[in-house]
């Protein structure tokens, strides 16, 4: 095959991935024109709809997109991939790699990363609510007599969206790219039409209008910044979803289609306001002629459902990562596709999200009311991403510190400006994502600290495995047929379940395997590096299985690899899995306060059973209880 053919195939693949990315990555930021400009000129802000104010706000929107999306995320942050994977937890794991595990900065970076992940959940409960509601509110423009149905229709759409999650979205997901492609072309066309009617709006490209607006209104303009940030919602998704599509397709889609379409639409809305300031009632839907209003409502609703789907899938992926990294208790994770490894469904997360989202929709009642709650979670995550990226630039890439200070300084000024403006909205609704984020942060840190204490207590009371096995083989107990697999969290200590089995049953299986799962700070582990088997003699094997934080441990696959390496065969019905069921007992021992220990004990008790998490047949499991005082 010629180089030309290779090149054309790569180009075709890049374009296909870019279209697929449009359907997943850009849904959130792509639907922000539905409410962003309307919220910026909210009557509560008191900004007059004069030509200079309109040009000033549009200029702010334009430069926010260019600086934050086009330069910060697409050019800089997307370079900081963890073996191809993006997202705040992947970035945190990358930033921790060169640091001393016991240093204060390590603890700070870890706390920042976890808090950023928690704020994502605060964002995840608002995005579906505000996106779907703002789309359905288009009915008030298209058919005003149906305006009383906005809330019920929104609720029905959201319930249906979460209900279908357990069946997977692989089939319908193939349509996401083409639909969002149509969406971006549509909003660009609507914008171009109105720009042609009021070409004066193009002068908003000049940053003079943004600075002039800021200097003329000062305090009011700072408040407006809290609404301007709504055009950036979903910018973090460009980085978080990088592992699914790669940096090149996302950059291609961002620069060629998404950013131009967004800019054209915002400028079109600005042009409409120059022509008719009363259009601020709903500037997005009033861009369309009356005959196209209803089709636009339908397309908008589908686009917001796709945007919501991306956030929901992101919540599943983030939860899975957090479980593997040890920040969240085990949860049942179901794979909804045999072909796509990332297609997962986490029932607990799904129904909790739906419950909170429905409460938000019913409580806030309109997208205008909800807009105040939106933004603070986004800007908090943006600030955290910038700080973590700075650590990576200095410690991992070894960039010049002065250069890093200049780059990060500019980004932090922008990010902190947006974050500060959104703090002004805490009372109007910003308390919601902050409260959700703070609660989750407390729970995750409690779980992480509690697991650390449990490991310390277990290690202190544990017996080293190697000398124990030597003594065991020197004076062997009665051997019985079959295979015993002891799942253990530490491959250097004797599993408590083995000690209990020897104490009560006084037998040892003819083939005994000690299996440990280890999560590394990379997203995926190569197959040939995953499983190591140490033969301890006399049918005793120590197996260590390594997984990335984007992978789910698979006992069956590990056994198949052990069988391949050692020429064994495993009959599942002739294999027993021994697990230690830990009961955590809160005490006044050093570690955590007693009330936090009780919270940890409750989380520990309600974590998914190892049999569910590791997909082990329940009828082949022997659980032996042990108490751990913390």
Swiss-Prot record:
It is a multi-pass membrane protein. Keywords: Cell inner membrane, Cell membrane, Ion transport, Membrane, Potassium, Potassium transport, Symport, Transmembrane, Transmembrane helix, Transport. One of its GO terms (molecular function) is potassium ion transmembrane transporter activity. It catalyses: K(+)(in) + H(+)(in) = K(+)(out) + H(+)(out). One of its GO terms (cellular component) is plasma membrane. Pfam families: K_trans, K_trans_C. The chain crosses the membrane at residues 17-37, 51-71, 105-125, 144-164, 175-195, 218-238, 255-275, 283-303, 344-364, 374-394, 402-422, 428-448. InterPro entries: K+_transporter (IPR003855), K_trans_C (IPR053952), K_trans_N (IPR053951), Kup (IPR023051). It is found in: Cell inner membrane. Transport of potassium into the cell. Likely operates as a K(+):H(+) symporter. PANTHER family: LOW AFFINITY POTASSIUM TRANSPORT SYSTEM PROTEIN KUP, OSMOTIC STRESS POTASSIUM TRANSPORTER. Belongs to the HAK/KUP transporter (TC 2.A.72) family. This is Probable potassium transport system protein Kup. It comes from Burkholderia mallei (strain ATCC 23344).
């Amino acid at each position: 095959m010629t180089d030309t053919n290779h090149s054309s195939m790569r180009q075709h693949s890049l374009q296909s991935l870019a279209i697929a990315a449009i359907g997943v990555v850009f849904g959130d930021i792509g639907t922000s024109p539905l409410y962003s400009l309307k919220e910026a000129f909210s009557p509560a802000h008191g900004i007059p709809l004069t030509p200079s104010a309109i040009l000033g706000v549009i200029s702010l929107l334009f430069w926010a997109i260019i600086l934050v999306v086009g330069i910060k995320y697409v050019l800089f942050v997307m370079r900081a991939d963890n073996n191809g994977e993006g997202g705040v937890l992947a970035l945190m794991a990358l930033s921790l790699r060169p640091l001393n595990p016991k240093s204060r900065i390590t603890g700070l970076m870890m706390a920042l990363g976890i808090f950023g992940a928690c704020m994502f959940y605060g964002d995840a409960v608002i995005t579906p609510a505000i996106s779907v509601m703002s789309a359905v509110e288009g009915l008030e423009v298209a058919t005003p007599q149906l305006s009383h149905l906005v809330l019920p229709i929104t609720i029905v759409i959201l319930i249906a969206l979460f209900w279908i999650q357990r069946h997977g979205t692989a089939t319908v997901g193939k349509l996401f790219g083409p639909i969002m492609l149509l969406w971006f072309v549509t909003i660009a066309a609507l914008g171009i039409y109105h720009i042609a009617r009021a070409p004066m709006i193009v002068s908003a490209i000049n940053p003079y209008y943004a600075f002039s607006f800021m200097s003329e209104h000062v305090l009011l303009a700072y408040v407006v910044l809290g609404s301007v940030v709504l055009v950036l919602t979903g910018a973090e998704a460009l980085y978080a979803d990088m592992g699914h599509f790669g940096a090149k397709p996302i950059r291609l889609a961002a620069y060629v289609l998404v950013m131009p379409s967004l800019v054209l639409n915002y400028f079109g809305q600005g042009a409409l306001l120059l022509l008719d300031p009363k259009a601020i009632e709903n500037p997005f839907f009033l861009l369309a002629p009356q005959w196209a209003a209803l089709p636009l409502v339908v397309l908008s609703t589908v686009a917001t459902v796709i945007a919501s789907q991306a956030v929901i899938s992101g919540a599943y992926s983030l939860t899975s990562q957090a479980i593997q990294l040890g920040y969240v208790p085990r949860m049942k994770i179901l794979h909804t596709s045999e072909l796509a490894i990332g297609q997962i469904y986490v029932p607990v997360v799904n129904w909790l999200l739906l419950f909170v989202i429905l409460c938000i929709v019913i409580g806030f009642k309109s997208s205008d009311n909800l807009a105040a709650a939106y933004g603070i979670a986004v800007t908090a995550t943006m600030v955290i991403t910038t700080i973590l990226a700075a650590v990576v630039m200095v410690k991992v890439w070894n960039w010049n510190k002065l250069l890093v200070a200049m780059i990060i300084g500019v980004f932090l000024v922008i990010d902190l400006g947006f974050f500060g403006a959104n703090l002004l909205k805490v009372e109007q609704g910003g308390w919601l994502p902050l409260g959700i984020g703070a609660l989750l942060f407390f729970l995750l840190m409690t779980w992480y600290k509690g697991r650390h204490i449990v490991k310390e207590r277990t290690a202190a009371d544990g017996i080293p495995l190697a000398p124990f096995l030597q003594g065991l083989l020197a004076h062997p107990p009665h051997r019985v047929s079959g295979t015993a697999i002891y799942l253990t969290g530490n491959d250097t200590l004797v599993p408590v379940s083995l000690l209990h089995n020897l104490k009560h049953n006084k037998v040892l299986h003819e083939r005994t395997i000690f299996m440990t799962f280890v999560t590394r700070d990379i997203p995926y582990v190569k197959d040939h590096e995953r499983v190591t088997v140490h033969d301890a003699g006399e049918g005793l094997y120590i197996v260590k299985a390594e997984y990335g934080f984007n992978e789910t441990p698979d006992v069956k696959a590990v056994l198949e690899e052990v069988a391949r390496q050692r020429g064994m065969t495993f009959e599942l019905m002739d294999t027993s899995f021994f697990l230690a069921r830990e009961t955590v007992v809160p005490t006044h021992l050093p570690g955590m306060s007693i009330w936090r220990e009780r919270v940890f004990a409750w989380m520990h008790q309600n974590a998914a059973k190892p049999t569910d998490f590791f997909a082990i047949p329940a009828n082949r499991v022997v659980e032996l209880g042990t108490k751990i005082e913390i």
